[in-house]
């Protein structure tokens, strides 16, 4: 289960107390869905994370996502799936940004050959219209 979640890729605001944890960002919708898929399938989880995190402000995040889409950007990812050949089924999870996949997911697809694999996708668009 490879997934891209804004919650995993956002810059924490200065007032977030990650040590005592009362204000840590809760799991995002996609992150939660990925966890459920993992529980049901017994598979592994792989969080797709960018090297340059997105803003924690939703409007600023949408602005950046729109710019990346306009430039057909492929944001750099923190790590790769080293043992992808070991899997014959891949689940992909992501939020619907600007009526499509986030550009980091496209980076993941460019960097990983899924030929011959059974691929299932799921997405969440609950934040799509909040602007």
Describe the residue ranges of each PLM region.
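Active-site-proximal alpha-helix that buttresses catalytic centers in soluble enzyme cores
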Residues: 1-131
């Amino acid at each position: 289960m490879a997934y891209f979640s804004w919650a995993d890729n956002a810059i924490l605001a200065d007032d977030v107390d990650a040590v005592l944890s009362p204000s840590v960002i809760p799991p995002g919708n996609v992150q939660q869905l990925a966890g459920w898929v993992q529980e049901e399938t017994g598979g592994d989880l792989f969080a797709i994370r960018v090297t340059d995190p997105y803003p924690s402000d939703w409007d600023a995040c949408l602005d950046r996502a729109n710019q990346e889409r306009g430039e057909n950007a492929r944001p750099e990812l923190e790590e790769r799936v080293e043992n992808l050949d070991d899997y014959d089924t891949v689940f992909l999870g992501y939020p619907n940004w600007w009526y499509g996949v986030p550009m980091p997911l496209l980076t993941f697809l460019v960097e990983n050959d899924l030929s011959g694999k059974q691929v299932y996708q799921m997405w969440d668009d609950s934040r799509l219209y909040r602007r």
